[in-house]
From Swiss-Prot:
Family: Belongs to the CCR4/nocturin family.
Protein name as catalogued: CCR4-NOT transcription complex subunit 6-like
Cofactor(s) for this UniProt protein: Mg(2+)
E.C. numbers: 3.1.13.4
GO CC field: CCR4-NOT complex; cytoplasm; cytosol; nucleus
Lineage of the species this protein comes from: Eukaryota, Metazoa, Chordata, Craniata, Vertebrata
Function according to Swiss-Prot or TrEMBL: Poly(A) nuclease with 3'-5' RNase activity. Catalytic component of the CCR4-NOT complex which is one of the major cellular mRNA deadenylases and is linked to various cellular processes including bulk mRNA degradation, miRNA-mediated repression, translational repression during translational initiation and general transcription regulation. Additional complex functions may be a consequence of its influence on mRNA expression. Involved in mRNA decay mediated by the major-protein-coding determinant of instability (mCRD) of the FOS gene in the cytoplasm.
Active-site residue numbers: 410 (proton donor/acceptor)
Length: 555
């Protein structure tokens, strides 16, 4: 989740005593560009030219003290307006489209003939000033409006009572990328990654565009469980799962559907009372027991790893260690039945292991260094887990790369970030700009696959060969709020062992625009994140005989 919050910056209304400068003919001749973001129309005007609605650069429009009896719906085309004054006109109604002008901070409707207001005004979640005095509005509306913080209360009331359109979402498309191998033995399984938006983060301060009833956990949890159950993934990685909800909702509901699970809360839970601990969020992994058997489970506390590897770095202690994000990992044994039929089975002594890792990195955009180091710490710990798992009796080989890895995460990092570069390219320069020129160099080598005393040639490397399941901009965004729309959730997999057969595509972006959905959650979308879902094809590292010959791994 990207906790940037609703815009509450100080708003300065236009100055009525402003002085304009008219360009001279010489300035015009010399090509000087004019800039005007405000427009005032006065003189007892009765109607407005349609060309006005093409001035989309306007931020302030003064239409007060005229004789306007109606405002056309096309006013909503002025999407950059933050100030609109319609006071002292002859308006008896307002267009519902006014509610689409979500940039508005000030809307003045004083001294008109308004008896009702369109409930769509409730969508103006950034509005700080609403002028309604001098209108014959109902007592219900005026009593709310005249309360302390009346503007906010009235807007919330209208948003909560606004009818929801459209009635349902269009289906997300399944994008097939490759057909399953029909010659070599392979196992196919699906993986979901989903940030479910923890209840304590789902506030009107952050998501003012969403009705309060649709932010309520009792409402949202139905949509979240519907999303999870509908796609029926073999492996499910969830972030922002509240501790109490894991034990009372997610685990019981998914156990009934043939899953087992593992969960760990953020590190802060350790120092909290039992009651407070219930509301700490964390990461969970679920897997279908008919397809996988749990071998090991692990929690990685980033603040503990940071403390153990600080090597005297103040930045490590003051910036990284203070964040209590965590990751979880499970080592699973893949059931032999998954490897298809009609082919020579894997040797009975071979056990195909799979590691699934899930993490949620720090949210703040100003802490790109922390996100990158948290990712390095997590991958380094996963490498340790793999090394231990690969040396277990019955495991195929001592090489950690022989055990395939699926890494799911809300990385809170865009595709062009150091975090994604590190995961995708096998490493990152130790002077990468995301480190912000802070002194991390010594301790970073603890997380490089070459080791503290190895030759790194100025790079921090991890040794895995990972690839994102969602490449080539298959998703335009995974997090969709008013403030921010971008890809920050990922599913990575070991490309030496696996192929992507397909992924769940995006919700139609045009549909979101056409229905004026400026951010999620929404009555039809229960989280501010969209789920990721991929179907992976796994080939065992040691392939069986085909016609008496060992076929090499094609990857």
């Amino acid at each position: 989740m990207r906790l940037i919050g609703m815009p509450k910056e100080k708003y300065d209304p236009p100055d009525p005593r402003r002085i304009y400068t008219i360009m001279s003919a010489e300035e015009v001749a010399n090509g000087k560009k004019s800039h005007w973001a405000e427009l005032e129309i006065s003189g007892r005007v009765r109607s407005l030219s349609t060309s006005l609605w093409s001035l989309t650069h306007l931020t302030a429009l003064h239409l007060n003290d005229n004789n306007l009896a109606r405002i056309p719906p096309d006013i909503a085309k002025l999407h950059n307006l933050v100030y609109l004054d319609l006071s002292s006109n002859k308006l008896r109604s307002l267009p519902a489209e006014l509610g689409n002008m979500v940039s508005l901070r000030e809307l003045l409707l004083n001294d008109n003939y308004l008896r009702v207001l369109p409930y769509e005004l409730g969508r103006l979640f950034q509005l700080q000033t609403l002028g309604l005095t001098g209108n014959p509005l109902s007592q219900d509306i005026m009593s709310l409006y005249q309360d302390p913080d009346g503007t906010r209360k009235l807007l919330n009331f209208m948003l909560d009572n606004l009818a929801v359109h459209p009635e349902q979402l269009p289906p997300r498309p399944w994008i097939t990328l490759k057909e399953r191998d029909q010659i070599l033995p392979s196992a196919s399984f699906t993986v979901m990654c989903y940030n479910v938006l923890c209840d304590k983060y789902a506030t009107r301060q952050l998501y003012g565009y969403c009705p309060s009833w649709a932010l309520n956990w009792e409402y949202r949890k139905k949509g979240i469980m519907e999303e999870i159950v509908n796609w029926d993934a073999d492996i499910i990685s969830l972030q922002e799962v509240e501790t109490e909800q894991y034990f009372t909702l997610f685990l019981p509901a998914l156990k009934d559907r043939g899953y087992d699970g593992f969960f760990s809360p953020k590190s802060r839970a350790k120092i909290m009372s039992e009651q407070e601990r219930k509301h700490v969020d964390g990461c969970a992994i679920f897997f279908k027991t008919e397809k996988f058997t749990l071998v090991q489970k692990h929690t990685v506390e980033f603040n503990q790893v940071a403390m153990a590897n600080s090597d005297g770095s103040e930045a490590m202690l003051n910036r990284v260690m203070t964040k209590d994000n965590i990751g979880v990992a499970v080592v699973l044994e893949v059931h032999k039945e998954l490897f298809g039929t009609g082919m020579k089975p894997i040797h009975a002594a071979d056990k195909q292991l799979l590691i699934v890792a899930n993490a949620h990195m720090h949210w703040d955009p100003e802490y790109s260094d922390v996100k990158l180091i948290q990712t390095m710490m997590f991958v380094s710990e996963v490498k340790n887990i793999l090394e231990k798992a690969s040396s277990r009796p019955g495991s195929p080989t001592a090489d950690p790369n022989s055990i395939p890895l699926v890494l799911c995460a809300d990385l809170n990092s865009l595709p062009d970030s150091g975090v994604v570069e590190y995961l995708s390219n096998g490493g990152v320069a130790d002077n990468h700009k995301d480190f912000k020129e802070l002194r991390y160099n010594e301790c970073l080598m603890n997380f490089s696959c070459s080791g503290k005393n190895g030759s790194s040639e100025g790079r921090i490397t991890h040794g895995f060969q990972l690839k994102s399941a969602y490449e080539n901009n298959l998703m335009p965004y995974t997090n969709y709020t008013f403030d921010f729309k971008g890809v920050i959730d990922y599913i990575f997999y070991s490309k030496t062992h696996m192929n992507v057969l397909g992924v769940l595509g995006p919700l139609d972006p045009q549909w979101l625009v056409e229905n004026n959905i400026t951010g999620c959650p929404h009555p039809h979308i229960p989280s501010d994140h969209f789920s990721l879902l991929t179907q992976l094809e796994l080939h065992p590292p040691l392939l069986p005989l085909v016609n008496g010959v060992h076929l090499p791994n094609r990857r």
